[in-house]
Amino acid sequence: MTRVINLDGESLTLEDVIAIARQGVACRIDDSAIEAVNASRKIVDDIVSEKRVVYGVTTGFGSLCNVSISPEDTVQLQENLIRTHASGFGDPLPEDAVRAIMLIRINSLVKGYSGIRLSTIEKLLELLNKGVHPYIPEKGSLGASGDLAPLAHMVLPMLGLGKAYYKGEFLSGQEALDKAGIDKISLAAKEGLALINGTTVLTAIGALATYDAIQLLKLSDLAGALSLEVHNGITSPFEENLHTIRPQSGQLATARNIRNLLEGSQNTTVATQSRVQDPYTLRCMPQIHGASKDSIAYVKSKVDIEINSVTDNPIICKDGHVISGGNFHGEPMAQPFDFLGIAISEIGNVSERRVERLVNSQLSKLPSFLVKYPGLNSGFMITQYACASLASENKVLAHPASVDSIPSCENQEDFVSMGTTAARKAFEILKNSRRIVATEIMAACQALDLKPENHELGKGTKVAYDLFRKEVNFIEHDKHIEIYDELNKASTVIEDPSFLEAVEQAVELSIQF
C-alpha cells in the first residue's frame, strides 16, 4: 500500500518532513482538520460582509495598516500582495527545501486559525503531490514579518503566475499547471496574507539542516573511531564510568557510540601501554562531539514545535475573536538555527584537525600525506588544505545572524530576526562539515591500509570500512587518480542513507543518552 501522511496541524514529525520533501511520499489533509478550517473561513467572510476593520483583510499591509480597503477590493488586495511581495534574489532553493516549505505551510494552515478556504489549501497540496515545485529564490527574507518574499514566490504558480519546475523542466507557472493538469485559482479575502505570513521558509530549511546534522553527528563519531584505530588510540577515555560522573547526555551518547563502533577492535591500546594520553581531538571526542549533540537535540525540539505551529497574522480564534500579534516573528527559530550552525561548525573543526593528524607523518608514523613514495607523490597534501579552507569558512559563517536587525516598512517592522539567513548559513556549514567528515573517513581508510600491521577493525568501523572500500579505492600513486573524483565519491558514499543504516544495523548509534 502506498504510504500517505495525514496532516492535522498537530502531529507532523521531522521524519515526515524528510519523507515528503526528499522521498516524494504523498500527504493529505486529515478529516479532523476540515471543520476548523471551514469555521475559520466563515469568520473572515463575515468580517468582509460586515465591513469590520481587520488587519490584512480590510486594511493595507505593514505600515499601510491604517488604510481602509473596500469590500469590493479585498480580492484584488490579495493578488496585489503576492505580485509585489515576490521580490526575492539569488539562486533557486533546492527541490527538497521547496517541498518542505509547501508541506509546513499546509500543516500550519490546516490548524484552522488563518481564515483560508479549504479549497485553497487543497490547491497547494495538489501542487505538492503532483510535483509542481515553485521557483523560490533563496534570498530576500528578513524572517519577520515571516518569510514574505519567498512565500509569495511559492504562491505565484497557484495563480498561473511566476515560474515552477515540473518533471525536470523550468516553466512558467501556467505551463507547469497545464502539464500537471491543475487549474489555477483566484485568492479570496485574507488568503494571500495567510499563505505568505509565517516562518515557513526558515523553518523548512532549518528542519532539513537539523535532520542532516543528526546524521552527521553519527558519521563524525564513526570518522573519529576510524582515526582512533589508525593511531592505536587509548580506549579508557570512553569508559562509561568516566562520563556518568559528568552526565551530559550528548557526552554519554558519544562515548557509548565510540565503544560500540570499536567493539572487538585490535587497533586500540590502553593507557601506559605505549603512552599515557592521546591528544584532545581523539581523547575528548565525547566532550566535543557531545556538546554539538546536545545543541542539535535542543534545536530539533524547537523544530518539532515550529512545524506544528500557527505563524500567521492576524489569527482567527475559534470564538470569532481576531488577534493581531507577532507569531510571524522568526526570533524563536533564528537563535536556535544560529546555534545549529555553531554546533555543526565545531564538528567540522575537530574533524579537520584529525585529518591533519592523519596526513602528518610525525603524528601518524605513516608516510607523509598518506601515500607511498612521498615527494614524487603528494597524496593527501592539498586535501588537508581544502578541509582547512572549509573549516575556516565555517568560522565566518558561524557568526550569528540573529544579532543583526534592520528596521523595515517605514519603521513599523522595526526589529527583525534574520532567521532565514541563520537557517541558510547553517545548511552551508552543514555541507562544508560533511565534506570534511567524508575526507576524514577517506583519509582514515587510506591510513589503515598503509599501516604495516593488519589488525581486525571494530564491529562498527569494519562495516563502514568495507562499504567505503567498495566505492573508494586505495590511492597507490598520484598518476593513477584525479583526487577530486575520489573526494566526491567519498562524499556521495556518506550522504547515501544506506551507508549509515548499514553501520547502525551492526551497532547502535544515538545522539542522546
UniProtKB/Swiss-Prot annotation:
It is found in: Cytoplasm. Pfam families: Lyase_aromatic. This is Histidine ammonia-lyase. InterPro entries: Aromatic_Lyase, Fumarase/histidase_N, HutH, L-Aspartase-like, Phe/His_NH3-lyase_AS. Pathway: Amino-acid degradation; L-histidine degradation into L-glutamate; N-formimidoyl-L-glutamate from L-histidine: step 1/3. The gene is hutH. The keyword Zinc does not apply. Belongs to the PAL/histidase family. GO terms for molecular function: histidine ammonia-lyase activity. There is a cross-link at A144-G146 (5-imidazolinone (Ala-Gly)). SUPFAM superfamilies: L-aspartase-like. Contains an active site 4-methylidene-imidazol-5-one (MIO), which is formed autocatalytically by cyclization and dehydration of residues Ala-Ser-Gly. The modification 2,3-didehydroalanine (Ser) is found at S145. Its EC number is 4.3.1.3. It catalyses: L-histidine = trans-urocanate + NH4(+). One of its GO terms (cellular component) is cytoplasm.
